[in-house]
């Protein structure tokens, strides 16, 4: 798709971050944004594009996580079908899908994916499902036809294995870091509750205000998803690279993902602002706040004392410490 700033060099860097290099793999890695048309989609007769290098291969093996998508619901969400329709399509292919109505996204993923299976030498796919601890739960090899029949079943299984914050709602959700290496939207809305298109998706915790403190190193300045928060920090904005962030928005058309929220000078001020702007809070003197490292790692989270009674009632929650003050440094930051 358009990852890596929609450049060949940027996509090579993403692979390098995952330890995938020519030296490590013992084979060439070809990266290009050039595409060729492989046919027309079966129902809407739209042109379907594919990476030119991949089109010249004798065979293609797909690999992707199967997981709930962040923007739509359907038989095929994030997985092997999407890896063909959007991933192998590079930016041009991704744009051709995203520039159509989000209401039919699930139909387009299947339609374009089937076009690949019918026109390209797909050998098969390797589907991976992760558990709530960001660990591999299942690895399954699929033939091209099994991708069509089995991926929907694997998607349903993935809904049962993903992580959840074990509270229905809070006043303020604090996310230390977002990034494309965490989720396509920077943070997974199936956990944060902050959906790009809430008219099509729901789930996750319901927070009146959301604060995002920083971006990951691995996202290389791509701050997509920061627009889903109400408050952020100057640190994040200083690390944000528009040339990495904006191409993703142009490709997926969700420009509000790139909007910059209110900027505070440090973490303390960001939290203070969010906490004082929650008119729906049940108790203004005992606010319910949750802090998570990112949406891929929520085994250990911090909660304010306002949530302690609910935590004690939940047998799935273990309270590890007594209440303590957040460890702000001399600059008012948490890290």
Which residues does each predicted region cover?
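Short acidic, glycine/serine/threonine-rich loops at helix termini
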Residues: 1, 5-11, 40-43, 71-76, ...
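Alpha/propeptide regions of enzymes that mature by internal proteolysis
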Residues: 3-30, 147-157, 277
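Short, electropositive alpha-helical surface patch
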Residues: 15, 19, 120, 141-144, ...
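Conserved, well-structured core segments that form the ligand-binding/active-site neighborhood
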Residues: 50-179, 205
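C-terminal non-catalytic interaction/assembly regions of soluble proteins
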Residues: 189-335
